[in-house]
């Protein structure tokens, strides 16, 4: 191992760059649908040795060493994000004649931007780099911090944070209930990078012992939490409707009536005799292909498809009149509709997809020919705030539309009082690629972090009822058409506290930074 580490440390030029990119790309194997978390042991061991090579070279100036550390981290991140996000280009091919030109921006440009965060993590870790365990702690702390920064800078995009690679199954997801995604990400980097200590032997016994304890604790806590009894409470049965409509068909005006009628047919499918009647039916995001409030006949048809006392929750487009001569505002919304055709509650999407649902700096970019992917004048408007949808029977749903479910910190706002999360989405843009699987895993982690069940309806999948520990009670696979009835228990309160998760993340970060600083100061004193 020492010989291998020495060879990697001595790499330079294109060989070093190629290994950095390849190491990041291999790490993407830990992500869904593969879920091979062990790949990250290789990736982060390689990264540490590459950084050792630019940190231990006495011929390099301080500033040059920092630049080299940044570029190694950037190349590592570029490989990781290209391998993990290449499927984003699939959305642009739905209307290839209009958006194919942007394919390089999605497949290479976005990874190049996201890789800057990993470059900064390595640069910051280089400031605290030392021999032995301290450098592993520094790298782990900086990756945790930059993953957190990635969740909100420039609207945020924490997709495929390193922590997801450490949580492929429910047994390995439960640590998120205590540490949150970013705390798990930091400790995951520590564990995955620990084998690099075998390359120099300094601090190897302690580092590997700590990594082993963390990994066993990760599994042990998972087993403990999964063994806890289910919460007591009222049972609610939901029907998930998955129409599996091709995205091109959804955008074709001539198919709108047929699409709406298909949802009505699936809603009215008889319930098997051995199952309870659904209390709530859920349709996916932007299911209704017209402004529902402007079409009373559609509301009557919905009422006709529902049985007495049932409620439909559906994704739709909401319009808001702005007065004479002013174009209306449009919102990506959720409606709750009762069996009388009355709208009981509504919620607007707050966190919009840039360049998908709106164009930032639209006045400037529109002159360059850059427009929304969605066919809507001016794009969607941002919802004012996110609030609970209160339904009959004590059901209080926290609404998340599409990729709003990927933002852990947004769970803090307005979650109090909720007894379930509703997530409607349309992943048909991404076809049969890793995208829908990655999106689904992130929804499962939000369930674990909040301790609340998630009711998830997706146009082409994956639709599922997820319990508060990330387990899938019932669902429909990707690209399947049909309905699924599932029953869950309304809990009196969430099993976890997302505010505590955030505090615990910063506590972990402080411990890692303290270890890195102590190690760094010890190295300086030895040199002096």
Swiss-Prot record:
Q: What is its EC number?
A: 2.3.1.269
InterPro entries for this protein? Apolipo_AcylTrfase (IPR004563), C-N_Hydrolase (IPR003010), C-N_Hydrolase_sf (IPR036526), LNT_N (IPR045378)
Q: Please name the top-level EC class of this enzyme.
A: transferase
What is its subcellular localisation?
A: Cell inner membrane
Q: PANTHER family per the record?
A: APOLIPOPROTEIN N-ACYLTRANSFERASE
Q: What does this protein do?
A: Catalyzes the phospholipid dependent N-acylation of the N-terminal cysteine of apolipoprotein, the last step in lipoprotein maturation.
Put simply, this protein is called Apolipoprotein N-acyltransferase
The scientific name of the source species is Allorhizobium ampelinum (strain ATCC BAA-846 / DSM 112012 / S4)
Gene that produces this protein: lnt
């Amino acid at each position: 191992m020492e010989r291998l580490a020495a060879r990697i440390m001595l790499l330079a030029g294109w060989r070093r760059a190629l290994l950095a990119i390849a190491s990041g790309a291999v790490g993407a194997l830990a992500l869904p649908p593969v879920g091979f978390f062990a790949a990250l042991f290789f990736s982060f061991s390689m990264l540490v040795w590459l950084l050792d090579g630019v940190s231990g070279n006495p011929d390099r100036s301080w500033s040059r060493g920092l630049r080299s550390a940044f570029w190694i981290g950037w190349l590592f991140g570029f490989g990781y994000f290209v391998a993990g996000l290449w499927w984003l280009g699939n959305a642009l091919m739905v209307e290839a004649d209009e958006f194919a030109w942007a394919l390089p921006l999605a497949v290479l440009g976005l990874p190049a931007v996201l890789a800057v965060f990993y470059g900064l993590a390595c640069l910051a870790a280089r400031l605290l780099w030392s021999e032995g365990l301290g450098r592993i702690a520094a790298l782990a702390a900086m990756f945790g911090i930059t993953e957190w920064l990635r969740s909100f800078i420039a609207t945020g995009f924490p997709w495929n944070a390193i922590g997801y690679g450490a949580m492929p199954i429910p047994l390995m997801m439960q640590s998120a209930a205590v540490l949150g995604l970013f705390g798990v990400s930091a400790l995951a980097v520590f564990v995955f990078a620990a084998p690099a200590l075998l390359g120099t032997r300094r601090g190897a016994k302690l580092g590997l012992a700590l990594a082993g304890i963390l990994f066993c604790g990760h599994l042990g806590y998972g087993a403990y939490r999964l063994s806890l009894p289910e919460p007591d409470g009222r049972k609610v049965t939901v029907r998930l409707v998955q129409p599996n409509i091709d995205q091109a068909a959804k955008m074709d005006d001539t198919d709108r009536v047929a699409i709406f009628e298909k949802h009505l047919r699936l809603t009215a499918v008889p319930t098997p005799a051995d199952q309870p009647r659904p209390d709530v039916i859920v349709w996916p995001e932007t299911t209704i292909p017209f402004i529902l409030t402007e079409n009373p006949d559609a509301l009557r048809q919905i009422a006709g498809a529902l049985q007495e006392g049932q409620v439909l929750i559906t994704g739709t487009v909401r319009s808001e009149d702005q007065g004479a001569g002013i174009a209306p505002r449009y919102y990506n919304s959720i409606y709750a509709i009762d069996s009388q055709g009355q709208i009981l509650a509504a919620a607007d999407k707050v966190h919009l997809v840039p360049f998908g649902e709106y164009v930032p700096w639209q006045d400037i970019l529109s002159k360059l020919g850059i427009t929304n992917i969605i066919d809507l004048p001016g794009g969607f408007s941002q919802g004012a705030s996110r609030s609970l949808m209160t339904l009959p029977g004590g059901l209080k749903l926290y609404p998340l539309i599409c990729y709003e479910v990927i933002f852990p910190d947004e769970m803090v706002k307005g979650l109090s009082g909720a007894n379930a999360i509703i997530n409607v989405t349309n992943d048909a843009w991404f076809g049969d690629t890793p995208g829908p699987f990655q999106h689904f895993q992130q929804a499962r982690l939000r369930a674990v972090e909040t301790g609340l069940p998630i009711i998830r309806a997706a146009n082409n999948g994956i639709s599922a009822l997820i319990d508060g520990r990330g387990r899938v009670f019932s669902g429909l696979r990707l690209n399947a058409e049909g309905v699924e009835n599932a029953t869950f228990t309304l809990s009196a309160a969430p099993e976890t506290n997302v505010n505590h998760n955030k505090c615990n993340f910063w506590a972990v970060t402080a411990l890692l930074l303290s270890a890195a600083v102590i190690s760094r100061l010890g190295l300086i004193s030895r040199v002096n």
